[in-house]
Amino acid sequence: MAKAKGPTSSKSNKPASPPKPSAPAVPAAGGATAAEGSPRTIASPPSDLNKVVKRTSWAAGDVIHRIHPSKYAADEFNPGPHGNSRFSPICNAAGEPIPTIYGGSTFECAAMETVYHDVPFAAGFKTIAKRKIRHHHHSQLVPSAEMVLANLSNKALRKIGIPRADLIDTEKDLYPQTRKWAEAIHAHCPDVQGLCWVSRQDDTAQAVMLFGDRLPSGCLTHTAPSVDLVVDDATYSALVQLADDIGVKITGK
């Protein structure tokens, strides 16, 4: 007996191929997912910051090394609202700019956080133009009284609820979000006079950022005259040595 023929069709009887799945979204650190071409989103500050922020102190008499534009005096706070740093410019709860000073526990830290901040983590020959260093001073400040600072070290950040990768180790595209944390700490922790963390650029030292409206007038004094980074021979030699340590050559005039 001949086998019965099945129904004929001009189309193939093969099942249609399922559509290719799209690549899964990669979650950003902290659990948020970044849309393509836009910065990822970090966690927002919790409402109970005053309870979870660990305090640390900067002792009276301990030097803060500051590298700053020559238009500012050694102890003069940056008034804001201009600039683009990790924790400044920021405003208080009334929307008024909070004056700030950045510094480090060593000269090398201050230089890495300013002069060499944008040197890439890449092997090979790297340069920085000498003109970018000009018109900057190195100042050494000491507080006349102990300062209370928010501790942003790894252990302390676990209690706050944000990893270092999201607050300290981010690139500039996330600075608008990291500044929200500085504003929140200022708003919720009335005793805190600034922030302190292990420097991203020099992890052998501490970086600090001070809230100018939380420090009494005259509490910062300089222990030595401010010196020009290029004009002062000893300071420029130290910069050249640090440049060599990180594989950078200072070029130009």
Where do the model's predicted regions map?
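Active-site and NAD+-binding cores of ADP-ribose-processing enzymes
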Residues: A2-P15, K20-S88, A122-K253
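Extended catalytic/binding region for NAD+/ADP-ribose chemistry, centered on the ART fold
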Residues: P89-A122
